[in-house]
Amino acid sequence: MAGSYPEGAPAVLADKRQQFGSRFLRDPARVFHHNAWDNVEWSEEQAAAAERKVQENSIQRVCQEKQVDYEINAHKYWNDFYKIHENGFFKDRHWLFTEFPELAPSQNQNHLKDWFLENKSEVPECRNNEDGPGLIMEEQHKCSSKSLEHKTQTLPVEENVTQKISDLEICADEFPGSSATYRILEVGCGVGNTVFPILQTNNDPGLFVYCCDFSSTAIELVQTNSEYDPSRCFAFVHDLCDEEKSYPVPKGSLDIIILIFVLSAIVPDKMQKAINRLSRLLKPGGMMLLRDYGRYDMAQLRFKKGQCLSGNFYVRGDGTRVYFFTQEELDTLFTTAGLEKVQNLVDRRLQVNRGKQLTMYRVWIQCKYCKPLLSSTS
């Protein structure tokens, strides 16, 4: 099992790394004194037991007919999920500003500049060619969110929700948010648990946020949210795996792309092309931020026989799917797309249910990969 400080991570980032907290379990007898412990190392016995559990729940695979159904009707399963839970399943992700300082006001470019300086690289301008320019999923946040209370009476949004982005005339001069000086895209935005905290926290008039999701129901919930402001945000339905559909922005126009527990939801064979397409949207010096499930996370170990689709890829009871990554797999995906590693680390967290005296070991992977600056060969 990889440690909390993976090999190959920039030393300067490892030295500064405080994001995941500093509550370490040094005395096992105190495990139930807090709700969570950070950077928990696994014993060899624990790692071996996790591997055996995965082998056991992977023996019996879902039949091919059902696998085809889960792929063809993936949008239906996600729409059903959001119709049931609406905006009450996940908490707003205010932790993002700690884990990803690039998203915090006035720090988005400074943090990136620091990294380039520390790595003796030229500092990117992060501007365009003009003058400025899911214990079912995630962390089982079954809490309502005040910021996600949507209007009960709104105009129909079906036309806006289902608009075909491929029909838009995308050019470098005019597109949604074309006058912005800093552009962020979240892929797999759900009901806005990342987007709205960003918009609420950052009042920079030059900021524009794009957000898309596979589920038209999720996008409708975003667009009917009282916090949704079309002058600062553009929400649209998009299939990450559809090579025929374009994004509503030109290539080389985005500063940040966010992937939070979304890449794991698609078929592994389609991941590389999806990342390749997203990479082309980044400006030179732009950053891709990811947080997703790691191999042997508690959610993976809880799957039963008959839920495995392929190696480390499973289907939940509601028909949605999830993959569990290794650091090496994610590094290959990003570097093959032409991005450079800034951060790739494992967050091993021990969550505790003090009432039931239960311990739950979570494994997540967090990545930051940067698009290289333009060179003479590009």
UniProtKB/Swiss-Prot annotation:
Fetch the Pfam families from UniProt: Methyltransf_12 (PF08242)
- CDD domains attached to this UniProt entry: AdoMet_MTases
What SUPFAM superfamilies does this protein map onto?
Answer: S-adenosyl-L-methionine-dependent methyltransferases
Its main subcellular localisation, reduced to a broad class, is cytoplasm
Q: Which residues carry this modification: N-acetylalanine?
A: 2
User: Which transformation does this protein catalyse, written as a reaction?
Assistant: cytidine(32) in tRNA(Thr) + S-adenosyl-L-methionine = N(3)-methylcytidine(32) in tRNA(Thr) + S-adenosyl-L-homocysteine + H(+); cytidine(32) in tRNA(Arg)(CCU) + S-adenosyl-L-methionine = N(3)-methylcytidine(32) in tRNA(Arg)(CCU) + S-adenosyl-L-homocysteine + H(+)
Q: What does this protein do?
A: S-adenosyl-L-methionine-dependent methyltransferase that mediates N(3)-methylcytidine modification of residue 32 of the tRNA anticodon loop of tRNA(Thr)(UGU) and tRNA(Arg)(CCU). N(3)-methylcytidine methylation by METTL2A requires the N6-threonylcarbamoylation of tRNA (t6A37) by the EKC/KEOPS complex as prerequisite.
User: Per its record, how is this protein called by name?
Assistant: tRNA N(3)-cytidine methyltransferase METTL2A
- Native organism is Homo sapiens
